Amino acid sequence: MSKITEQVEVIVKPIMEDLNFELVDVEYVKEGRDHFLRISIDKEGGVDLNDCTLASEKISEAMDANDPIPEMYYLDVASPGAERPIKKEQDFQNAITKPVFVSLYVPIEGEKEWLGILQEVNNETIVVQVKIKARTKDIEIPRDKIAKARHAVMI
């Protein structure tokens, strides 16, 4: 997490708690010439457009008062969607037995990306059951090698 996203999270998290929303993710990216602050929120039963609008208004007010971002940017508040990021310990626990996509910093068994069913989670590793050709195999992945993890939609 970058310094900017950490600072934004400190500002936004109490606002989301007051609204009874979960702050799922904060991402600050540059795409072409534009900068985007993307904030994913959720709540029991999911968020709708009205929830995102309300959260966006509250976040805008707070960021205007104490903005850690020096350049102009677009604020995007949305649901995390079906491919929700997996970052926190509880996210990993909730994803057990579900399809996940994991990107790695370094290859494991020659691959830097794995798609499969999350089988196990502990402090050091996760185990993802993957299909290779017609066989299933458990891949043990050290948590410190995970660049990104998210829920996956498997068809």
From Swiss-Prot:
InterPro entries membership: Ribosome_maturation_RimP (IPR003728), RimP_C (IPR028998), RimP_C_sf (IPR036847), RimP_N (IPR028989), RimP_N_sf (IPR035956)
PANTHER family per the UniProt record, alphabetical: RIBOSOME MATURATION FACTOR RIMP
GO biological process, one term: ribosomal small subunit assembly
Official protein name in the record: Ribosome maturation factor RimP
Keywords linked to the UniProt accession: Cytoplasm, Ribosome biogenesis
Residues spanning the membrane: none
Main subcellular localisation: cytoplasm
Function description: Required for maturation of 30S ribosomal subunits.
Entry GO CC: cytosol
Family: Belongs to the RimP family.
Subcellular location: Cytoplasm
Record gene name: rimP
CDD domains: YlxS_C (cd01734)
